[in-house]
Amino acid sequence: MQVSDFHFELPDELIARYPQPERTASRLLQLNGNSGELNDGQFTDILDLVQAGDLLVFNNTRVIPARMFGMKASGGKLEVLVERVLDEHSVLAHVRCSKSPKPGTMLLLGENQEHEAEMVARHDTLFEIRFTSDKKVLDILDEIGHMPLPPYIDRPDEDADKERYQTVYNKKPGAVAAPTAGLHFDTEILEKMKAKGVEFAYVTLHVGAGTFQPVRVDNILEHHMHSEYAEVSQEVIDAINATKARGGRVVSVGTTSVRSLESAAQHALKQGTELAPFFDDTEIFIYPGYEFQVVDALVTNFHLPESTLIMLVSAFAGYDNTMKAYEQAVNNKYRFFSYGDAMFITKKTA
């Protein structure tokens, strides 16, 4: 398939630049992967779509304030976007400035250039940066970092984004982009699901800035996915096995949860073992033709044209079903991308 097969026209006004006043106030487009049937509704309808015995799998990563501004010690403004925290004092980051810094370049970061760091090495398009102070990287980011809103939101971050560009169940710091399907859940709707007999499990995938990188090839088979770190614990494996045994569904909240679970499944297939814990980097690329091993239903936002995420949704729901759903979403003026509306999709099995 060609990348252009996943193109659709999206009016600029449908890109959500701010979240709804309430997390659960978004709309929900339901898609039946087998029949292709579409139903327009509200996100709160999800309470009727999940059943007792189902397992919802959330990504509990926490978005770090990964964007920093500053200058080279020799002069010249720059912007640093952390891609990954390497250890307590080092990060791997994208650096935007007029001239790329060379190893040994000293950087002064923060509004008042209060934190000094050294550009230690370059790894392809990324720069390894080490802070010189005894403070831990995460503490420095909390002090001077900005929330790394996606480029299409096209506005500076605001105080409200510290809360709203974060799930209510976040736990493990490390993401530089939110697992956005989870943004629709508040504590009240989670409590109602629990009361209904729905089970919860949590994986961790630290979403990288690579999630926003365009696919730069024509044939999707030539695309190489960026690497992200994922954790699927024994507790999650046990919950999945128990769910399948009782006839329940594994409902993935977000494409990052899908990629975590299916990475564990693919690793087990390669090893010739039962589904087992997974703690490793993953470059899994899911596109039409992929056979899902774990996930039965998916909660997800509306994704960018020609992105790997709309390819994943097409693999899950069927290509034609997905493109028709997106056409309806545009016609019915759903809000798109990170702060936008959501879909509830059941897997195409026939």
From Swiss-Prot:
GO terms for cellular component: cytoplasm. Its main location: cytoplasm. It comes from the Bacteria. One of its GO terms (biological process) is queuosine biosynthetic process. Keywords: Cytoplasm, Queuosine biosynthesis, S-adenosyl-L-methionine, Transferase. Transfers and isomerizes the ribose moiety from AdoMet to the 7-aminomethyl group of 7-deazaguanine (preQ1-tRNA) to give epoxyqueuosine (oQ-tRNA). This is S-adenosylmethionine:tRNA ribosyltransferase-isomerase. The gene is queA.
